[in-house]
């Protein structure tokens, strides 16, 4: 790299092992021709030993330097240490090679001073005294002060941060502290944080201000969050109680299954209890739950008025005429099987053919006369246990008790599944339309226990109790009307 005329290239000792000797300005400002010797690197003043720049005289190069004609002398004086000057170079040394710099800032030194001068400090102090009420210079003011004081922007910001910290320590603070602004540098922020930690009084004042601001800034979103949190907590408590009730219900179902598997006749439908006593007990239950019936019928009126199974039920009653209990006994069995969920067990599928066969037998027996059907259902508990226990299917507990109709709306959010939950209001077709289903003994017992275990589901248990009106009383009413 070649340098322009008038500029003296002065390499430092850290860059070149053998530095170039200093030349006077007359050497550089003298006439130059293309015959000036150059090194292969293209530098006019090459520091390498093999250069022939000044070892021979060139035509037209009038050098005032007193070089001897001996190349060896020129070589030693050119390559030698700059501190060991030869006699031939003594006249050309106008200044020491490592003397004062030519420019404002020396080569290799940092562009700015590390410490501020007195003039710069005085300028910054004057600005600080003028702005004692707000000693936070803006970005533009910092740039202006940096230009005036010949300091960097970071140095100016740090100086003001330190000045504010000193004033705080000396209790000469005449401004209100503010939060860290965006235009302040990181070191200034660190200094401010240290300052707040150093001054305990300011910490107390800041704590009071933060407390007041926290009360004032309590936004509606925080209030909504607290409210939602409370609702979630209540929901968890309800889920806990529901899980407990479901666990107790499963235990009850297991107990009932274990009791029913031992004897052929169900202990829930004791054989020693006469049909007349059962009818009296059912009449009492019907009277107790009559007021529940009125409210539930209004709720179920709209959803079940056009239920297809309900329409089938009514049409069958109209067609059969006087044989009303035959229609009800035949119709109640198939919809109970269709109202199941999709989760059927293998045992249930295997016994489905037996169910159909027994249901046809029961229909044939009940189809003789209404009086004979009453006698058969009362006198043969061993042949058809479901006739006494009033189950929708002909096998005792052929499916899990949890999936029976009164349990599903009571303990889940699902609606009704069949005409068993249909509208039970007065009908002009026949009095037996008010009959619901054959759930008499077992469901009433289990529901009474479930009501004691799950009191929070009071409304649901009332709807379950309404569904437990039994058909013997309704059948008696139908026969009396005949």
Curated annotation (Swiss-Prot):
Residues 173-307, 462-482 are annotated as: Disordered. The keyword Membrane does not apply. It holds the Pfam family Homeobox_KN. It comes from the Eukaryota. GO terms for molecular function: DNA binding; DNA-binding transcription factor activity, RNA polymerase II-specific. It is found in: Nucleus. Residues 182-198 have a biased composition (Acidic residues). Residues 284-305 have a biased composition (Basic residues). The keyword Plastid does not apply. Expressed in the neural plate in overlapping patterns with other irx members, which all share an anterior border of expression. Broadly expressed in the tailbud rhombencephalon (hindbrain). Outside the nervous system and at tailbud stages, expressed in the developing otic vesicle and branchial arches. One of its GO terms (biological process) is embryonic cranial skeleton morphogenesis. Residues 109-171 bind DNA. Residues 199-256, 467-482 have a biased composition (Basic and acidic residues). Coiled coil: none annotated. One of its GO terms (cellular component) is nucleus. Disulfide bonds: none annotated. Residues 264-273 have a biased composition (Pro residues). Keywords: Developmental protein, Differentiation, DNA-binding, Homeobox, Neurogenesis, Nucleus, Transcription, Transcription regulation. This is Iroquois-class homeodomain protein irx-5. It comes from Xenopus tropicalis (Western clawed frog).
